[in-house]
UniProtKB/Swiss-Prot annotation:
Protein name in the entry: Alanine--tRNA ligase
InterPro entries in the record: aa-tRNA-synth_II/BPL/LPL, Ala-tRNA-lgiase_IIc, Ala-tRNA-ligase_IIc_anticod-bd, Ala-tRNA-synth_IIc_core, Ala-tRNA-synth_IIc_N, Ala-tRNA_ligase, Ala_tRNA_ligase_euk/bac, DHHA1_dom
Function: Catalyzes the attachment of alanine to tRNA(Ala) in a two-step reaction: alanine is first activated by ATP to form Ala-AMP and then transferred to the acceptor end of tRNA(Ala). Also edits incorrectly charged Ser-tRNA(Ala) and Gly-tRNA(Ala) via its editing domain.
Name of the gene this protein is made from: alaS
Superkingdom field: Bacteria
Length: 845
């Protein structure tokens, strides 16, 4: 049985509109990830936005609980039901139906569609909710209805705001299997398993804690797909269900060891974590040093450590992406489109961590030998800072053997060195929204209309004026700054990567910014004359908008070119367009070659030269997705979306664009670079900006020729390079004569250092002078890092040393046991590589 489909179809038959799963990265600054089915509807429940039509919805929402307030990461693998990634089935009513229907629907679905045994079902209600009790009594015997207090059966969105009693449905897994002290209704045992929570949002709580009835009570329900699947299949752990067992079997094949539930925590960790990793990367989250990207990194590194316990010491997680796509690609088709890109990104990150995990574990074991109960915070920090071990990974390893880490000392070192800035998810923008009069304006006027697609000039009425504190005022005096709400505005509010419009009101009042607050398009104005609410004013958008539109359209063509040349797995990770340039971030695991960049540039210019009118359509979101239009996961869309077609490009977009591709003129790539692991960036110019760029380039090239005193720049540069090479050789000879300081441990001398001279000659010299030695040298030359290692009568292999070091530096290499060389291109990580090599040698000798 496809429970996901059965659930959605059931509620669709009851008049609910099926809503696609919202992005895992929510449009909510207070949340790290979407962690519940109601998150996409939060602003509807709070009244911040009008209720939709129809006001009843159903969804299967993908959720992440790792990091932030809701963090299940530490428990995953060790319990039957904790997950970092899960799917939440839900039905929602925004002031339409209430308890009677919600309870009836839930009972019908569970007993008639899922056909769960009625004799194994129990429900709970709030101790004061007589209404819910009486409704349930129509469906189930009263002795199966339990009353509990606020702790168990009252739900609140926060300290203030919408809240209400809830009712939970439980399934009895059997006294014959569960008979512990906590295995009773209301206990913490596993016998009675909660499967569905029905929240009756009927009150508003104020700051004093007082409850007042909501004018239109709402319904929010949630049922975990993994949990109900396990019950339906008659297994006691979610991990024993058809959702996880194919992944666990895949891990068995990789490690060659059979899975046993009692000792299978590592299998379960890997099976859970690969789902989170796959979905997050598919939706544009990438490995990073902070924020969501760092949570993603923690999840992968935790899985790799558990893989290490199973004997998996080479990259393996990326191979499991195929299994996730096979299991879930039929419902989430974007997984199939991005599968190969996801695999490459994961593999690259695996290689980074696996290059240091061995030495990190050696350091961990060495410190463990000196640990009684509490593991050193200093060593935990070193594991984190040098070897990439997240603190919770170290804590996880210690928990398995009954020890703890000194987190206080770890935090102290973090603060001292400021190695990682904690991501803050509540910005100043949210404070503005909290104190502003936006909600009142929305209730009074609704969303004001943007007419800038058709015109850059208008006569509009001032509906409202806000001062700098975003409070309503009747008038803005000359010489002041404030925000104006027009009934119809030609000014584009910054969104979707496109910069805001500027312009003039009544010829002399400068529009300096335009932003959107709760659906309201507001323009910031520096006044030279008085402006009053009710005034009819002339509005004019700056000409810069025309160039911005050209760059925005070029961005769409670039996206199409990238997908055609690099593969359909390429996804947009961000963009920024203005009148002077465009910037496009996209998921791709490696830097682009000059040949690829030329192909991309030619592709875009070819699309421009073909011309063709742009086309926009307002479509139902599900219809738009089916039509092949591309959407961005990080954007939040309504029920209706604007779909833009430019030649072969078709995307969701609310921005302004050219009417015909010819208007773009020409397109030129200025720069390609890396943003973070698995994310690349292209910066480009078009139209007038491209012409200006060409002029500046010609001028700079002329200056180069003048500086070289030659019209043949290439030959002059070659001559200079030869002279530099000759000078470097002289420096190298001088460096080779320098005395090298050696360290010693257990009778073996060793050195790890940067060296300007001939590193092979120096290693040979040291090996001739010493009976037992390990030498590793780094040399920067021509934008790359050269690595050489020499070993004589020591328990290390030079080939293995350079191989691991090169991974840190983004390169590769190898060689004999006594001598080996390698290269790398990431010069920013030389210090990390030096420290790693030094620790590796110390651990081995």
């Amino acid at each position: 049985m496809d429970i996901r489909k059965e659930f959605l179809d059931f509620f669709a038959s009851k008049g609910h509109e099926i809503i696609a799963s919202a992005p895992l990265v929510p449009d909510d600054a207070s949340l790290l990830f979407t962690n519940a089915g109601m998150v996409p509807f939060k602003n509807i429940f709070t009244g911040a936005v009008p209720r939709p039509t129809p006001p009843i919805r159903t969804s299967c929402q993908t959720c992440i609980r790792a990091g932030g307030k809701h963090n299940d990461l530490d428990n995953v693998g060790y319990t039957a039901r904790h997950h970092t990634f899960f799917e939440m089935l839900g039905n929602f009513s925004f002031g339409e139906y209430f308890k009677e229907n919600a309870i009836a629907y839930a009972w019908e679905f569970i007993t008639e569609i899922l056909k769960l045994d009625k004799d194994k079902l129990y429900v709970t209600v709030h101790e004061k909710d007589d209404e819910a009790f009486e409704i349930w009594a129509k469906h189930i015997a009263k002795e199966r209805i339990y009353r509990f207090g606020d702790h168990d059966n009252f739900w609140a969105m926060g300290d203030t705001g919408p809240c209400g009693p809830c009712s939970e449905i439980f399934y009895d897994q059997g006294e014959e299997y569960f008979h512990g002290k906590e295995d009773y209704m209301g206990g913490d045992g596993d016998r009675f398993l909660e499967i569905w929570n029905l929240v009756f949002m009927q009150f508003e709580r104020d700051k004093a804690g007082n409850l007042s009835p909501l004018p239109k009570p709402s319904i929010d329900t949630g049922m975990g797909l993994e949990r109900v699947t396990a019950i339906k299949e008659g297994v006691f752990s979610n991990y024993d269900s058809s959702i996880f067992m194919p992944l666990i079997h895949a891990v068995e094949k990789l490690c060659g060891k059979p899975y046993k539930y009692e000792s299978g925590a590592s299998y379960r960790v890997i099976a859970d974590h690969i789902r989170s990793i796959t979905f997050l990367i598919a939706q544009g989250v990438n490995f990073d040093k902070e924020g969501r990207g760092y949570v993603l990194r923690r999840i992968l590194r935790r899985a790799l450590r558990h893989g290490y316990l199973l004997g998996l010491k080479e990259p393996f997680m990326y191979k499991l992406v195929d299994n996730v796509c096979e299991l879930m690609g039929h419902h989430y088709s974007y997984l199939l489109e991005k599968k190969e890109t996801i695999k490459e990104i994961i593999k690259l990150e695996e290689e980074r961590f696996l290059s240091t995990i061995s030495a990190g574990l050696e350091l961990f074991k060495a410190q463990l030998a000196n640990t009684k109960d509490v593991f050193s915070g200093e060593i935990a920090f070193k594991l984190y800072d040098t070897y990439g071990f997240p603190l919770d990974l170290t804590a996880d390893m210690l928990r398995e053997i009954g020890k703890k880490v000194d987190e206080k000392k770890f935090d102290e070192l973090m603060n001292e060195q400021k190695a990682r800035a904690k991501a803050s998810w509540k910005g100043s923008g949210d404070k503005i929204k909290e104190k502003g009069d936006f909600k009142a304006l929305l209730e009074k006027f609704g969303e004001n209309k943007f007419i800038g697609y058709e015109t850059m000039k208008s006569q509009s009425k001032i509906l409202a004026i806000l001062n700098n504190d975003f409070r309503n005022v009747d008038e803005l005096k000359a010489g002041n700054i404030g925000w104006i709400m027009l009934d119809e505005t030609p000014f584009y509010a910054q969104s979707g990567g496109q910069i805001y419009d500027t312009g003039l009101i009544n010829g002399s009042n400068k529009v300096t910014d335009t932003q959107k607050f709760f659906g309201l398009n507001l323009s910031e104005v520096e006044t030279s004359t008085n402006l009053k609410v009710g005034d009819i004013v002339k509005c004019e958008v700056d000409e810069a908008r025309i160039e911005t539109a050209r760059h925005h359209s070029a961005t769409h063509l670039l996206h199409l070119a990238l997908r055609e040349i690099l593969g359909s797995g390429v996804g947009q990770a961000g963009s920024s367009v203005d009148s002077e340039r465009l910037r496009f971030d996209f998921t791709y695991p490696k830097s682009l070659t000059s040949e690829q960049l030329l192909k991309i540039e030619n592709n875009v210019n070819s699309q421009i030269s073909k011309g063709g009118a742009s086309k926009t359509e307002i479509m139902d979101i599900n219809e738009a997705i089916k039509s092949g239009a591309i959407a961005m996961f990080s954007e939040k869309y309504g029920d209706k979306v604007r779909v833009l077609t430019l030649g072969e490009s078709k995307e969701f977009c609310g921005g302004t664009h050219v009417r015909n591709l010819w208007e773009i003129g020409s397109f030129y790539i200025v720069k390609e670079s890396g943003v973070s692991a698995g994310v690349r960036r292209i910066e480009a110019v078009c139209s007038k900006a491209a012409i200006n760029y060409a002029k500046n380039f010609r001028s700079e090239f002329s200056e180069v020729q003048n500086a070289l005193k030659s019209n043949e720049a290439l030959s002059a540069i070659k001559k200079l390079k030869d002279e530099i090479k000759s000078l470097k050789n002289e420096i190298s000879k001088a460096s080779a004569a320098k005395v090298i300081d050696l360290d010693e441990k257990n009778g073996i001398k060793f050195v790890v250092s940067e060296f300007d001279g001939d590193i092979k000659t120096k290693i040979d010299e040291l090996k001739n002078e010493n009976d037992k030695i390990v030498a590793v040298f780094f040399k920067v030359e021509d934008g790359r890092v050269q690595i050489a290692a020499g070993v004589k009568n020591a328990p290390l292999k030079a080939g293995e040393i350079v191989k691991q070091i090169a991974k840190i530096l983004g390169g590769g290499g190898g060689g004999r046991d006594d001598f080996a060389t390698a290269g790398g291109k990431d010069m920013t990580k030389i210090d990390e590589a030096v420290n790693f090599a030094r620790d590796l040698i110390k651990a081995k000798i």
